[in-house]
Design a protein with these regions (language model features):
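Membrane-embedded hydrophobic alpha-helical segments
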Residues: 1-40
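Conserved non-transmembrane functional hotspots
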Residues: 26-196
Length: 196
């Protein structure tokens, strides 16, 4: 080996070491940023599910099941005008089942509106809150013994249930995807001892 080539070899080795160190740093930095973004995204998805779309979904499903049960008890296939002989049962179901579920949903929509997926408030959510407010007026009349109005003057927004189900399902799918990606599992194994 030529003595003149030793400095060149050492020089090349030093350059290669610096390149490898910088590459390792950039790869680590990039993966840390990607994992942080994924973690933040998962945190937002979880918050939306736990505080907004989850409660809306559960209350909506429970309300739908209860409403179908009431219709079945009354021998009806679909919503029809409430007859005089059904009024007592209707008031009971409204005050003990439907309005408490409506109140839960109304509170979630009003207090957690910042968690909606869209940039603008979906019209069906506004229509739902308006529907509930209409029922509050009807129920105030009931409390005074006035039963001429039987339903909210603002009808049930049919797209509300579709929106809630679709949004909940999309967020659950996104949550599952974020939780089960290979990078996320590796991150948890390395830094938390197990995959979550």
């Amino acid at each position: 080996m030529d003595l003149l080539s030793v400095p060149t070899i050492l020089q090349n080795a030093a350059i290669l070491t610096v390149i490898l160190a910088l590459s390792g740093y950039f790869i680590t930095s990039l993966s840390t940023q990607m994992l942080a973004r994924r973690r933040d995204k998962l945190r937002l998805v979880n918050k939306r599910l736990n505080e907004f779309y989850g409660p809306l979904y559960v209350a909506s499903e429970a309300g739908d099941i209860a409403y179908r049960t009431l219709l079945k008890r009354q021998g009806k296939q679909r919503s029809e005008p409430i007859r005089d002989e059904e009024m007592k049962e209707w008031v009971l179901w409204m005050t003990t089942i439907f309005m408490p579920l409506n109140d839960i949903r109304e509170k979630v929509i009003i207090e957690k509106a910042h968690l909606i997926i869209e940039e603008r408030m979906p019209q069906c959510l506004l229509d739902f809150v308006t529907h509930v407010v209409g029922y509050k007026a009807v129920m105030a009349k009931w409390a005074e013994g006035e039963y001429t109005e039987r339903r909210s003057t603002i009808g049930w927004p049919p797209e509300f249930d579709v929106y809630v189900k679709r949004s909940y399902a999309a967020l659950k799918a996104e949550q599952t995807s974020l939780l089960h990606s290979g990078t996320w599992r590796l991150y948890h194994r390395l830094f938390h001892g197990k995959a979550k």
